[in-house]
Amino acid sequence: MIKDYFKIDKNPKKGLLPLEWAMLGYMAITVITMLFAFTKVVNPESMLWGRLRILVITLALWGVYRMIPCRITKMVRIMAQIALLAWWYPDTYEINRMFPNLDHIFAGWEQDLFGCQPALLFAKAMPWAVVSELMSMGYFMYYPMIAAVVLYYFFCRYYEAERASFVLLASFFLYYLIYIYVPVVGPTFYFDAVGVQDIAKGIFPALGDYFNTHTNCLPTPGYTDGIFYQLVEDAKEAGERPTAAFPSSHVGVSTICMLLAWHSRNRKLLFTMLPFYTFLCMATVYIQAHYLIDAIAGWISAVVFYFLLMAASKNMRCK
């Protein structure tokens, strides 16, 4: 019943939610990293102020929940932390830009494993408008898939809503930690910096701190007049940075979404998401956002993160 979501909880949770603690843990680790390398951080003041604002938002929403302890105010707390990922993602670039780029290593591994650069060849092999739009559609559906899983658990499986949200958010922060300390930018940035012709010849130079001052990338391959193509381009212009390539969190988190859908035993949810998930995974290489090894690492890491976090949260239940 809808009214249940506005009913005052008789035994409200007094402290922070586990996903809020996960955020604070990530915040603490990044602040410590910044302090150790403070002289190299480009925008330390804005980064610290941003963290302070997030802390204030978190505590303010906790205060609202304490005043009006119901399911809706708890959902607002959860959705706020998920929405704030849009701030945390580009923030990874502000930290990892201090470290030497590692794309030459990963592009070399890609060449050794597959004898080519799949990110260069995939779109060329399938340049058709229909394929391009399906790929862009899948890539665009990343955040809607996350929202669908969170909202499904909240409205249809409430007793595990807090757990599912924790697994998703903690997974994001684990990926973000990897991105900070393993600075890989992906084909669209690295190939643009080196030159596609040299990449095709198997030339993968080390670029050091090049991406500390350069953020140019290749134009996305595909059908440029497509609706979903334009939506993906708009998203790139709004928040894309030379960061977060290995492992692919698009593949990883969407895989965790699929595992949570499987855990819910709702076949309709699982099979509705399946085609979007399939195209999303393919799109990561098609649009040159990731190397193929990034996608493979995304699948492997997703399974590891999912089962570790599900085990850690097995006693997490909402009443």
Feature roles, as predicted:
Residues 61-71, 151-159, 261-265, 307-313:
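Structural signal for the C-terminal ends of transmembrane alpha-helices
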Residues 181-263:
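Membrane-interfacial catalytic/cofactor-binding modules of polytopic membrane enzymes
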Residues 131-145, 241-262, 292, 296:
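Membrane-interface loop-to-helix entry segments
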